[in-house]
Amino acid sequence: MTVYNINLGIGWASSGVEYAQSYRAQAFRNLNISAKFVFSDLILGNNIADLTANLGFNADQIIWLYNFFTDIKIAPSTFLLDTFVEQNHLEQRNFSLLPNNGTKELQYKSEEEKLTIVPRYNNREKQTIDQVTYIFNNRLIKRDFYSYTKYATEYYSGEEKDNQVIFREFYNENGTIAYTQHLDGDGHELFEFPDQNYYSKTDLYREMLRKFNFKADDIIILDRMDEDKQLVNGQLIFEHHLPAKLVIPVHADHYDKHYTNDHQVLWNNFYEYQFMHYQDVAAYVVATDRQRDLLASQQKHFNHAKPQINTIPVGSLEHLVKPKGTRKKHSLITASRLANEKHIDWVIEATVAAHKIVSDLTLDIYGEGGERSRLQNLITKNNADSYIKLMGQHDLKDVYQKYETYIAGSTSEGFGLSLMEAVGSGLSMIGFDVPYGNQTFIVDQQNGYLLPYTEDWSNSRKEQLLADAIVKNFTEADLTSFHEKSYSLAESYLTKNVAKQWQQLIGELQHA
């Protein structure tokens, strides 16, 4: 039996879906269940093995569409700079190494060949590289990609104004070309193999599914589908998953309440296809009981259907994290992508207001995203740089325990992994009474404050509610009691307990 987990892309700053897969991978490892994680985006900015290892995946768990048709293994970048220099005879060809200013890129230049070769360090200390760029007459013409060997090359048109990739080669271990991807510049592509051509990425994906040769005891967990305009993967999986069982996790609010009434429902567009084809789905998995009950009632009302819906948290805790010392007094932490929908600006404004009463109050904001500069400007505008800080991207598992309280401004979380990790470190919690994460991890007056929320309220009213809760939390609340309640809530999210829920579902599906 193998569990195939279907995704599209992954990066250094991943979303909740990738983190959910990472937690699931850990649960499956604990159960000794064979699991594969399938990615189909063209991921060349970094070695996919490095990106997935960053989230705790094992390299042998990863299947990447573009690598699948070669015999090169998914593996870390271990190719040495010295090996590259030697193999390409750079010294004999009289290439000179230009002074390096400490960046990840080196420049080898030949005036005679009018060529600059730019290897990029993957790890400067280990002297390993993951990319090499070739610039001829000041124009990019080629880029090679390395793990333990060269696995791909992309070739550019070399034009002055519209220099774009015209084809890519993907290699086998012995250096032979496994296949070539041709691009016409208008979004069309052709994958040329020695014995066959595939005229779209969708066709190539279909061939990969065919080669998986699904068995009756296999399970496919479809985490993401159809965000890539070059690929229609969701429909393909619905069409070709048999005899395996198909499971659909719901990672977000699954419908739009503004356009839903007794006569119609507007499903979240990322899940509409999956909900309308419920006959093909062995089970839906949601993160909270509240979402399970709502989805079940909507399926019954609108589709006259009664599909199997299981509650399994998308995250889990290896263990409860107790503070190694004294928690920093009057300290707030929040962690998320720096995106508009997270409403971190409300949290900043609330902290500024509360700071007037709790004078040693601090807020540390963890995460990266497109809103970073705007949020920094807001902090500076409020003269709050001394007590509100953007901390960047970090592994927070052992960071939460340094703080007293977690605060969330988000008004919609399918689950809220950072909320789970915060209660697992015993923090008191502040957030709005909105589906589904806050309602799961905040018990009002017991481990924090679950604040009333109406969308139509002004931002200043929402900010004031948060500010009042901050002040109350640090001036009136029994934080020791709040911290103990958070630890108690977190018990059911320990990996060993979540793994049992997966084990039960998989057992049911195998015997269905």
Curated annotation (Swiss-Prot):
Domain of life the protein comes from: Bacteria
Subcellular location: Cytoplasm; Cell membrane
Pathway assignment: Protein modification; protein glycosylation
Keyword annotations from UniProtKB, A to Z: Cell membrane, Cytoplasm, Glycosyltransferase, Membrane, Nucleotide-binding, Transferase
Catalytic activity: L-seryl-[protein] + UDP-N-acetyl-alpha-D-glucosamine = 3-O-[N-acetyl-alpha-D-glucosaminyl]-L-seryl-[protein] + UDP + H(+)
List of residues binding N-acetyl-D-glucosamine: 251
EC code(s) of this entry: 2.4.1.-
Entry's Gene Ontology molecular function annotations: glycosyltransferase activity; nucleotide binding
Keyword match Nucleotide-binding: yes
InterPro entries: GtfA, GtfA_EBD
Residues the entry annotates as binding UDP: 16-19, 393-394, 413-416
Primary residence: cytoplasm
GO biological process: protein O-linked glycosylation via serine
GO cellular component: cytoplasm; plasma membrane; protein N-acetylglucosaminyltransferase complex
Membrane topology, from the record: Peripheral membrane protein
Entry annotated with the keyword Ribonucleoprotein: no
Pfam families, per database record: Glyco_trans_1_4, GtfA_EBD
Family, as annotated: Belongs to the glycosyltransferase group 1 family. Glycosyltransferase 4 subfamily.
Main function: Required for polymorphic O-glycosylation of the serine-rich repeat protein (SRRP) in this bacteria. Catalyzes the first step in glycosylation by transferring N-acetylglucosamine from UDP-GlcNAc to serine residues in the substrate protein. Part of the accessory SecA2/SecY2 system specifically required to export serine-rich repeat cell wall proteins encoded in the same operon. The GtfA-GtfB complex adds GlcNAc from UDP-GlcNAc to SRRP (experimentally characterized with a truncated SSR1 construct); the alpha linkage was shown for this enzyme but not the residues glycosylated on SRRP.
Record text on subunit structure and interactions: Forms a heterotetramer with 2 subunits each of GtfA and GtfB. Part of the accessory SecA2/SecY2 protein translocation apparatus.
Protein name as annotated: UDP-N-acetylglucosamine--peptide N-acetylglucosaminyltransferase GtfA subunit
Organism annotation: Limosilactobacillus reuteri subsp. suis (strain ATCC 53608 / LMG 31752 / 1063) (Lactobacillus reuteri)
